[in-house]
Amino acid sequence: MAELIEYYGTGRRKTAVARVHLRPGNGKIKINGKEYKSLVEYLRGNEVWEIEALKPLTVTSTNGQFDLVIRVNGGGLSGQAGAIRLGIARALLSYDESFRPILKKEGLLTRDPREVERKKYGLRKARKRAQFSKR
């Protein structure tokens, strides 16, 4: 049996985690076991998130060269799109290390550290307080 060639990368954003497998192919997308024509279908019609998520493939000119097999969970669609983007970028590095300067220049290898700030007791939200009255 022929050995399956596969390149793997993990991406995280907010509370979303994406495990991305790149397989040589023609651009098919499979997310959580379900086939999609494009990422827009999974991201409920938001083309901006699709463009962002597929940016690593665009900047390295590898669009349509790989089939994407993605397992993503946690967070909302925006966080999942960001996690997929980082996962694809890291998987591309395992495919070809010469992509590193291109991906780094575009900022695609950096994990976005921004998380939701926790709510503090005595406050309405993380920072919102009740109105202060001097008298």
Swiss-Prot record:
Pfam families: Ribosomal_S9. Keywords: Ribonucleoprotein, Ribosomal protein. One of its GO terms (cellular component) is cytosolic small ribosomal subunit. SUPFAM superfamilies: Ribosomal protein S5 domain 2-like. One of its GO terms (biological process) is translation. InterPro entries: Ribosomal_Su5_D2-typ_SF (IPR020568), Ribosomal_uS9 (IPR000754), Ribosomal_uS9_bac/plastid (IPR023035), Ribosomal_uS9_CS (IPR020574), Ribsml_uS5_D2-typ_fold_subgr (IPR014721). PANTHER family: RIBOSOMAL PROTEIN S9, SMALL RIBOSOMAL SUBUNIT PROTEIN US9M. This is Small ribosomal subunit protein uS9. It comes from Petrotoga mobilis (strain DSM 10674 / SJ95).
